Amino acid sequence: MKENLKILIADDNELMRLVMRGLFIKYLDNPSIKQTTNLDDTFECLSQERFDLLLLDINMPNGDSSPQTVVDIKAIYPELKIVMFSGNDKETLEPEYLAAGAIGFIQKNENMNTCTKEIIETVL
């Protein structure tokens, strides 16, 4: 398994950030994990450091993450893997985000253990 994977978790919900951080720590060797709580801070963090994976919530303060947000991020950071993370309906939204460049979509009520493993396999 790849060591030192750099992950940015962008979600305004502290519990969701803690859960996902714990799962990444469980399944990865020595991951570097940073967290942001709004879209402005997410862009600022991306501008300061290179990440392997961005776990991006759709509904956040200072602007929601639309498919265009994914397009904009990928234009600046083409190697960055983006996974959407939302309580919104996956079936409706996932195709739009995948078409925009995201590699996955986790709905918050899904089995996060399984989804996290699948995402790690995709990123590695």
Task: State where each predicted segment sits.
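Acidic, metal-coordinating helix/loop segments flanking the phosphotransfer/catalytic sites
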Residues: Q35-L53
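Short amphipathic alpha-helix used as the core "switch/output" element in two-component signaling
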Residues: D64-P78
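Alpha4 helix (beta4-alpha4-beta5 surface) of REC/receiver domains from two-component response regulators
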Residues: D89-I106, E110, T114-K117
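Two-component/phosphorelay signaling modules centered on CheY-like receiver
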Residues: E14-K34
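Non-catalytic signal-transmission and effector/linker regions of two-component phosphorelay proteins
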Residues: M1-L8, N113-L124
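Conserved acidic carboxylate
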Residues: D11
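The short loop immediately C-terminal to the conserved phospho-acceptor aspartate in CheY-like receiver
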Residues: N59-P61
